[in-house]
């Protein structure tokens, strides 16, 4: 109550922000008349003046009013479009590390030109980030004339560009591209072997379009560069044949009654679990096929990999649906983005799930992958010095933007009042009744000439509706992941009189639906349109536009509520752009997944109380509230998943920053001779401490062990025992100095023989390749650790603290291994000439060429509640073949340490 009263008196935080920016808008408007009288050359010269002022010590805020006024005037001349005052406010929000919520049709693309130009003046680079290559290319080409008029260069960063083209794109003042490409380039730069191979400059300013899609929907998906691991396609095919023999259990087991099924599904958590009966049945089937020894258990340590394959196949068959979660195209399984309905070529599910789905669909099974480098979008974007974003729907996620990224959300008022009519939801008992009502609504709209956009949550739904409309002989266009080639054309004409367009989630489509159809596209379709043709097209469009407005504008029809209110708002936001007429309504049924999983009991009881009969719809605020509460529950759960993923990735991120910084230092250094000398001294001291403990008596020295280790690992044949026998005054400290001197002198002799330049180059190559190899193994170990860490909760330990502690131990072990491996290689390898180093480099390049880029999709579920798969992944490294190694035996890795002090630490 008091909060509302204070807001009434002082205004909300949003109002106060808008008021402050409103004062700057008045300053910008004050320059309009003066700048309107400048010649083109005088206006272009402003860029040089602003840059000189910035170099002289002025800030971007100092030049902002004049810079924005310059862009507005240039836009009037180049595009014949003038920035509205609300767009100027949007530009200021984006320049001040905030998120601007701007409704559809309010000109986000034009708004972005203001902060992009202002920050482009610094010469440090501006990255304008969109969700797909089409939008990146379109926005770059559309805005290029404006930026080039003002003397700024524009680059496009999309998939498939070569290194030279990428470097040129990044060197431009303003670079348009997709989040995937910027992220991949960051990882690739940190796998480069020379400064010349890097393409990115330091990350300065990122301006993200559809920011909620990239920073929230994509946040559960780590970005991964991977290389192919071993081929196990035959095993996936064999395991796939078992699953159709299993039966789903309808009810959960209770103390009184044990169910009949082989597996149970938890739809909420998207998990499937084998029952005891199912486990026994699978063991029998595996034994019959000769894949499991008679009497052996699927859960024994030696069969963990087999259990992992069975679980992956079970998930593929029970949780992942064709034309909902993925499509099959050109003998490949392609994931469909649940948020946008777009296909995501090149993106693959992790933990063998993608291979299991490929086996289920009978397509070519690709090899499993090994992670070479990875980062989450959250940690990638947090590295930018300045970060801002814009979207039509950010307010529902404002808390997450602030909590994770430190970005405030400001809602920008519309240029014209919103007049769209949002009707309450209609809820039916069955899906059949719901679809009958939807078709009836579409028929009504067509009769009065009102265009309809029908939003579905899956390809399967859009095709069901397609068949129903065909049956009723209603002409319509369908837009989903299978028919996306004509996307821009279909969306552009979706506002024509009586048009019916069925589309999967419309998020991020990027093309405005103009009432009466898009006349610009009609003109562009003509080769050389005359003025008469242009005038006729525009006049015809005006008639159609008025007809559509009289019919009620664009009608949005949702066939189901999405898990996120934001996606529903994005669909609604397609109508009512720039004060246009419009309406919207969602049709639901008790069989919809959201209702069935999260809201069924409460809503069903309400329906009974309200005396609902078959074929009737319910329209009541109680029901709408219950549905909204169900959506809030899902949003909260998804936020927790993203937050947990970030907390775990923050640990890896600290290590990633250390490794990448070290790598870049190595690469930029002309010589790492001093580093190698320091490592050599460290390695010798560690060996000495191990075999000749400090301040110990000679009887405790293991001289023979030290001589053997030096010879085996470092090809150093030193007569240490002979020295000790001959020289009485040789004690531990002087012996240590002699070994160091002998070692360094031997290395100097190698340098004289090979040549200093060749050896320096070789040292750098060895150091980088060894670091990359160990980092790759470390990432794999971290994955296994993370997937099983939740089990520590059963031992009354905090999984996050345990993960931090153990990952730090793994990291220390990696750094120790790096020192020993580098010195071992440099000691053993005989470099004859420059050609040897070049050959090594060439081999490395060939291996790099084989690396394929992949996404690991929905990996976060392994952290949150994936009991079985996480347990399997955690125990996988412990599978052993052959004899058991005793804790006090020498470690099989050849380090010379006891097993318990080396790789036994990980057991």
Curated annotation (Swiss-Prot):
A single Gene Ontology biological process assigned to it is:
protein targeting
Q: What is this protein called?
A: Protein translocase subunit SecA
Look up and give the membrane topology term.
Peripheral membrane protein
Q: Which UniProt keywords apply?
A: ATP-binding, Cell inner membrane, Cell membrane, Cytoplasm, Membrane, Metal-binding, Nucleotide-binding, Protein transport, Translocase, Translocation, Transport, Zinc
**Protein localization:** Cell inner membrane; Cytoplasm
**PROSITE patterns, from UniProt?**
SECA, SECA_MOTOR_DEAD
Under SMART domains, the record lists: SecA_DEAD (SM00957), SecA_PP_bind (SM00958)
- Coiled-coil ranges per UniProt: none
Q: Which reaction does it catalyse?
A: ATP + H2O + cellular proteinSide 1 = ADP + phosphate + cellular proteinSide 2
- Residues holding Zn(2+): 891, 893, 902-903
Q: How is the cofactor bound?
A: May bind 1 zinc ion per subunit.
EC no. given is 7.4.2.8
* Keyword Nucleotide-binding attributed: yes
Report the cofactors: Zn(2+)
Q: Which family does it belong to?
A: Belongs to the SecA family.
């Amino acid at each position: 109550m008091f909060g509302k009263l204070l807001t009434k008196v002082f205004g909300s935080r949003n109002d106060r922000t808008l008021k402050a920016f409103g004062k700057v808008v008045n300053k910008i408007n004050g320059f309009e008349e003066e700048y309107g009288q400048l010649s083109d050359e005088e206006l272009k010269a402003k860029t040089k003046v602003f840059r000189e002022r910035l170099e002289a010590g002025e800030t971007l805020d100092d030049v902002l009013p004049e810079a924005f006024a310059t862009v507005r005037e240039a836009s009037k001349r180049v595009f014949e479009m003038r920035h509205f005052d609300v767009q100027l406010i949007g530009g200021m929000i984006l320049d001040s590390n905030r998120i601007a919520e701007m409704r559809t049709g309010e000109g986000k693309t034009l708004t972005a030109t203001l902060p992009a130009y202002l920050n482009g003046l610094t010469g440090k680079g501006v990255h304008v980030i969109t969700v797909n290559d089409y939008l990146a290319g379109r926005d770059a080409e559309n805005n290029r004339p404006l930026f080039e008029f003002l003397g700024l260069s524009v680059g496009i960063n999309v998939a498939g560009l070569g290194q030279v083209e990428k470097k040129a794109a990044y060197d431009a003042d303003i670079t348009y591209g997709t989040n995937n490409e910027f992220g991949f380039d960051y990882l690739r730069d940190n796998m480069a072997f020379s400064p010349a191979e890097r393409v990115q400059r330091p990350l300065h300013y990122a301006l993200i379009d559809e920011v909620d899609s990239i920073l929230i929907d994509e946040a559960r998906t780590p970005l991964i560069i991977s290389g192919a691991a071993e081929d196990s396609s035959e095993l996936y095919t064999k395991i796939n044949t078992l699953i159709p023999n299993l039966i789903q259990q309808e009810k959960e087991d209770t103390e009184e009654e044990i169910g009949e099924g082989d597996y149970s599904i938890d739809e909420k958590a998207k998990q499937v679990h084998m029952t005891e009966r199912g486990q026994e049945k699978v063991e029998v089937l595996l034994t019959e096929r000769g894949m499991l020894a008679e009497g052996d258990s699927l859960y024994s340590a030696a069969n963990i990999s087999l259990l992992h394959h069975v679980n992956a196949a079970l998930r593929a068959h029970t949780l992942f649906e064709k034309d909902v979660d993925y499509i099959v195209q050109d003998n490949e399984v392609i994931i469909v983005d649940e948020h946008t309905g777009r296909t995501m070529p090149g993106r693959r599910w992790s933990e063998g799930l993608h291979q299991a789905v490929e086996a289920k669909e009978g397509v070519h099974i690709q090899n499993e992958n090994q992670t070479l480098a990875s980062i989450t979008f959250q940690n990638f974007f947090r590295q930018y010095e300045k970060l801002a974003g814009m979207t039509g729907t950010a307010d529902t996620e404002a808390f997450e933007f602030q909590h994770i990224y430190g970005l405030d959300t400001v809602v920008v008022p519309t240029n014209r009042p919103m007049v769209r009519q949002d009707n309450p939801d209609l809820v039916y008992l069955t899906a059949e009744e719901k679809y009958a009502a939807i078709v009836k609504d579409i028929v009504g709209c067509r009769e009065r000439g009102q265009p309809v956009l029908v939003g579905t949550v899956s390809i399967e739904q859009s095709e069901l509706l397609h068949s129903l409309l065909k049956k009723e002989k209603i002409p319509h266009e369908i837009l989903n992941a299978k028919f996306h080639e004509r996307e821009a054309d279909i969306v552009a004409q979706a506002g024509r009189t009586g048009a019916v367009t069925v589309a999967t989630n419309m998020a991020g489509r990027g093309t405005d639906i103009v009432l009466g159809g898009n006349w610009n596209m009609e003109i562009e379709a003509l080769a050389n349109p005359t003025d008469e043709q242009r005038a006729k097209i525009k006049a015809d469009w005006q008639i159609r536009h008025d007809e559509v407005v009289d019919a009620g504008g664009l009608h949005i029809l949702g066939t189901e509520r999405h898990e996120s209110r934001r996606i529903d708002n994005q669909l609604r936001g397609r109508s009512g752009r720039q004060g246009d007429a419009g309406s919207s309504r969602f049709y639901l049924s008790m069989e919809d997944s959201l209702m069935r999983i999260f809201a069924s009991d409460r809503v069903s009881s309400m329906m009974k109380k309200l005396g609902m009969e078959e074929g009737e719809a319910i329209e009541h605020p109680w029901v709408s509230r219950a549905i909204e509460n169900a959506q809030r529950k899902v949003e909260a759960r998804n936020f927790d998943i993203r937050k947990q993923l970030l907390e775990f990735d923050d640990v890896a991120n600290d290590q990633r920053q250390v490794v990448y910084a070290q790598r870049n230092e190595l690469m930029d250094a002309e010589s790492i001779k001093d580093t190698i000398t320091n490592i050599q001294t460290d390695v010798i001291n560690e060996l000495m401490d191990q075999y000749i403990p400090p301040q110990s008596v000679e009887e405790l020295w293991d001289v023979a062990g030290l001589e053997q280790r030096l010879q085996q690992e470092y090809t150093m044949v030193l007569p240490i025992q002979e020295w000790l026998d001959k020289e009485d005054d040789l004690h531990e400290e002087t012996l240590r100095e002699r070994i160091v001197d002998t070692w360094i002198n031997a290395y100097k002799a190698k340098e004289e023989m090979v040549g200093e330049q060749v050896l320096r180059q070789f040292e750098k190559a060895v150091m980088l390749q060894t670091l990359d190899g160990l980092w790759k193994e470390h990432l794999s170990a971290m994955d296994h650790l993370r997937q099983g860490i939740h089990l520590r909760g059963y031992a009354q330990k905090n999984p996050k603290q345990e993960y931090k502690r153990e990952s730090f131990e793994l990291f220390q072990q990696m750094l120790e291994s790096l020192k020993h491996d580098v010195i071992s290689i440099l000691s053993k390898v005989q470099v004859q000439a420059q050609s040897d180093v070049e050959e090594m480099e060439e081999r490395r390049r060939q291996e790099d060429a084989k690396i394929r880029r992949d996404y690991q999709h929905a990996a976060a579920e392994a952290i949150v509640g994936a009991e079985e798969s996480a347990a399997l992944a955690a125990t996988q490294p412990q599978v052993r073949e052959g004899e058991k190694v005793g804790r006090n035996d020498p470690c099989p890795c050849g380090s010379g340490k006891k097993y318990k002090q080396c790789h036994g630490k990980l057991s």
